[in-house]
């Protein structure tokens, strides 16, 4: 029954999806849902819209709560996670991560894989005195990142259009044509989402990032690099050992075992960020929510609020 309803809804959506003008008008009509209470039913509507290939349309920015007490304007894009800003009052994106961050404070934040800037904007709102460095190599995602930063006047965020890798230079970046938020330096990962566009992007190494560190300051490093987390962490080895930052890492596919083999991470305690709350773990494993928080063993007193 559910699949039948999904197919029927998709068939209806395909009619306005036939042109940019009708698609834009039709999708804008869904903005009325923001006036209704959030719930799982909104995700059901999102799913039906995701079944259709839409032309590229421009939708107006929409204000939504990113975390309790912190609202921002985001530009929504149908088929991408930021489209939730068009439908929801409160963004449903990664609540486990946002809950972990809620009671923490940092002076310096390095976000690797900033994408369209959801967390960059949130960090800027939550920690207006912090210095935030956001790295995103994908051209489309970076353009959207800049747009969202400008909309929210995020003056304490410094964006960089580049990747982080073992060596500085230029690398091939693979961007799935219909999944722009899943671009990666790992071709096999990107191709799992369909055909890819290949571009050359600049890269910095951990040595260059070390210059951004302010010794003795509270630091967070957040990495969401679609499978390249182990390589990035190895590039940042000197910085991590010297500054002992807190970290949030996305863990997917075959990444867990690679992370478990990184010796300097044994100086950290690991917490799976789960819907029911953080759960300490001895090793990395692939979980449904995917994200881990890492806290230096010497600084663990306030790891779990």
Q: PLM ranges: what are they?
A:
Residues 1-135, 143-148, 155, 213-215, ...:
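S-adenosyl-L-methionine
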Residues 50-52, 57-58, 67-69, 73, ...:
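Mobile, glycine- and charge-enriched loop segments
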Residues 86-110, 170-172, 186-243, 254-257:
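Short internal loop-to-helix segment that lines adenine-nucleotide cofactor pockets
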Residues 106, 127-134, 209-305:
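Conserved acidic-Pro-Pro-aromatic motif
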Residues 118-121, 143, 169, 230-234:
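Short N-terminal helix/helix-N-cap motif within the alpha/beta-hydrolase-1
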Residues 138:
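Conserved SAM/SAH-binding beta-strand->alpha-helix loop
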Residues 146, 150-178:
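Core alpha/beta nucleotide-donor-binding catalytic domains of modification enzymes
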Residues 170-174, 185-186, 261, 282-285:
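Short aromatic-enriched loop/helix-cap "lid" or pocket-rim segments at secondary-structure transitions
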